[in-house]
């Protein structure tokens, strides 16, 4: 295998160290010479001059540089930076366990692209029991910073084509698709500036992670095949996470824009733009029998949601074999929706369960202290005049639900209808029960809608 030396530009201006042993041809630039790189990007605030590691790029889409990448990560670990250069592509074709990290930067200015070798990835991955999730790699440790102007490419089109017509939550589903970016047992992770493109499944999944932030990130999933949509490509999913911050981020994908899942606390979201999504969703939780799930202390502010199924949504499972828990202390503030089927929805009849089954086996997840403030814009009219559907289970508690300054309209006509069933106390606005004859036509198919994961 041939390895590239440093580009002539760097060779002429930067003294570098040839590293014997693992990866011939790679270079490590000492910390005192990093300043010579000048315009390659911003420096870590705490350590402005870091040793920088450069690895060779791929020659083509079949040239797997997984070993080079792992080598570079190890050399950059504990105080260094791995630089993935602008205009270069780095193909990853092997699963990577990166859970040993401490004080590392990865400057992604080029493109990191995964292979679409479906048989390999379905046999070689990191598996999570929660909703049968798999990943290409996993990042863990502490003080991890990923930044730059480059692209993390999941190369998802083949996965979209082959998964068409299937459902992720079908118990018989065996076609597992990798998640693009996973953290596990990680503390203080920062991601900034990059683009995440065409994940085969969820885009981000954070597991047993504390203090993770995303800023100025663009998440995009699109399909070139109109009959094979980029399904389940959620922007952000969490499991056992304390401290998630998402700011100044754009999401254009085929599922939840944001979806904190079981045992997630202390979430802050500000300046988020979502197009074509299933909304900013709390959950789903309560899926697994006998398991306690919690989502608590969430603040979501200044969000635009366009052309989607949902706006601000809470979702909990119902049925004969489900879990229990609570979603508590959640605020949605300054939320702008346009052409959205369900601008505000509390859904305690999730997933694929009709009204009769939900009444027989209601949810055991409590919704408490939920505030929707300054929610404005238009619904799609899919559910008639209904612009908010707040439906709680008789088995669960729904209290402290407050709506303030709601300015939503429907193309189906006026006045807009807010439906509330099973809510304890005053919600702050006029609402009607779904059993009221005057609202039944407005509600339309809302009660029987089968939401996707």
From Swiss-Prot:
GO terms for cellular component: extracellular region. GO terms for molecular function: galacturan 1,4-alpha-galacturonidase activity; polygalacturonase activity. Keywords: Cell wall biogenesis/degradation, Disulfide bond, Glycoprotein, Glycosidase, Hydrolase, Repeat, Secreted, Signal. Belongs to the glycosyl hydrolase 28 family. The active site is at residues 255, 278. This is Probable exopolygalacturonase B. The keyword Nucleotide-binding does not apply. It comes from Neosartorya fischeri (strain ATCC 1020 / DSM 3700 / CBS 544.65 / FGSC A1164 / JCM 1740 / NRRL 181 / WB 181). GO terms for biological process: cell wall organization; pectin catabolic process. The lineage of its organism: Eukaryota, Fungi, Dikarya, Ascomycota, Pezizomycotina. Specific in hydrolyzing the terminal glycosidic bond of polygalacturonic acid and oligogalacturonates. PbH1 repeats lie at residues 295-316, 327-348, 362-405. Its main location: secreted. Residues 1-16 form the signal peptide.
